[in-house]
Amino acid sequence: FMNISGARGSNADYILPTASTAAIEGQSLVARSSGNIIYAGSATAKNNMIADDKFSLTSIDKAVTKAETEGGGSDGVIRITPLRIDGVDKYVCLVHNYQEHDMRTSTTTGQWLDIQKAATTNNGTKNPIFTGSLGEYRGVVLHKHNKVTRFKDYGAGNVAAARAIFMGRQAMVAAFGSPANGLRFDWAEEWKDYKNRLGIATKCIVGLKRPQFNGNDVNSIVIDSAAAQPY
C-alpha cells in the first residue's frame, strides 16, 4: 500500500515506524505525481481539505473522466489502460472502510442498490476482480481494505484522511531476481536424522514497484478524501 500510495501515512498497523520514508534502506518511497492525485469534495490540495470533503460517487466520477480523457497525445502522458473483462473495459478502486462508510451514507438507497446489483450480476464471472467486491459504478469495481493508507495531518493539520487507489491494468509491477536456471524460486530438500525427517527450504528475490513514465504515474490515480473514524 505504501508503494502505490507513495507515502507512509499514519496507519498504526503498518510494520514500518511512522517516521519511515523507505521500506528498504536506500530505496525511498516515491511520492505520487501531482497530476495523478484527485481530491474529494471541494478540496484542491492537501492543505485546504476540510472534514466535509468526504469520499462519494462524485470522487469516482472524477477519476473515470480523468482516466478516459487525459493522456495518449503529444503531452507525453500515458493514458490509463483499463482491464478488459469479457470485452468490456473495467477499473478497480480500492477504498478504506471509513471511505466506504462515507460513500454509503451519502448515497441514496436506490443508488447503492444499483451498485450492489452490479456486483451480484458479476458474481457469475470467473474473473477474480469481482470476488468480494462492494459493487460496481460506471465500470469501476469497488473493493474495501482496512490497510489503505490513512493520514491525520490534512487541512490545517488536523483533518483525518485516506487515500483511495483507482487502478487500471498493471498499476503495480513485480520483478524477480533469479539464478541462472531462470526460475523465480529456489527449492532445496535435505534428509536429516538418518532420513527420518525431510528439511525443505525455499527462497526468492522479488520487488514491487509503481510504474512511472517521464515522472508521471502510470495506470493508477489516488483519491484523497477526509475520512474520520465514524464511531
Q: Language-model segments: what does each one mean?
A:
Residues F1-S20:
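Short, glycine/acidic-rich hinge or "gate" loops at secondary-structure transitions
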Residues E25-I78, K90, Y98-Y231:
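Sequence/fold signature of self-assembling virion shell proteins
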Residues V77-I85:
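Surface-exposed acidic, glycine-flexible loop patches that form ligand/cofactor-binding
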Residues C93:
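Polar-ligand-bearing catalytic/cofactor-coordination segments
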